[in-house]
Design a protein with these regions (language model features):
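Conserved active-site tyrosine of GNAT-family acetyltransferases
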Residues: 29, 33-34, 101, 126-129
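Conserved beta-strand-loop-alpha-helix junction that forms the acyl-donor binding cleft
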Residues: 23-26, 116
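Short glycine-/small-residue motifs
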Residues: 131-134
Length: 139
């Protein structure tokens, strides 16, 4: 892209996204994401704590405490409303990740399956009802 005086103007490049998950208890959520899903706590903020972030590799999930339900009833599970979507690079990795979460006793909304478009996916249900999609590429 060029500007009037022949200057080149760089277009901003979006490099990542961070999902914000609504939770009831920041400590319980951090414990779930670290103990069950292999994330680490990047930070917890507030007194009492109401905001935090967990990370694993290049994935970041923000956790925000809310005092009342954000969604009505079981609409998230009924309508399969995802709170976050995380990807891995290979079919071997998605299978390995699924098996490690299964061994850790993680509750699944959907077990590992091949989607009609070829991707391999599974969905984890966290203690607050957030649906976290994990996806790998087609074969």
């Amino acid at each position: 892209m060029t500007h009037e005086a022949g200057q080149t103007v760089l277009c901003p490049v979006l490099s990542s996204t961070e999902a914000q998950l609504f939770v009831a208890d920041i400590k319980a959520s951090c414990d779930f994401y670290t103990d069950k899903l292999g994330f680490t706590v990047a930070f917890v903020y507030g007194d009492p704590p109401y905001y935090g972030q967990v990370t694993r590799d290049h994935a970041r999930l923000n956790l925000r405490v809310v005092g009342e339900p954000v969604f009505v009833g079981d609409i998230r599970e009924r309508e399969h409303l995802l709170s976050a979507s995380l990807t891995v690079a290979s079919t071997d990795e998605i299978k390995q990740l699924f098996l490690s979460y299964q061994a850790a006793g993680v509750r699944f909304h959907q077990t590992l399956k091949k989607e009609p478009w070829g991707a391999r996916t599974f969905i984890v249900l966290d203690p607050d009802g957030n649906l976290i999609l994990f996806a790998g590429p087609a074969d």
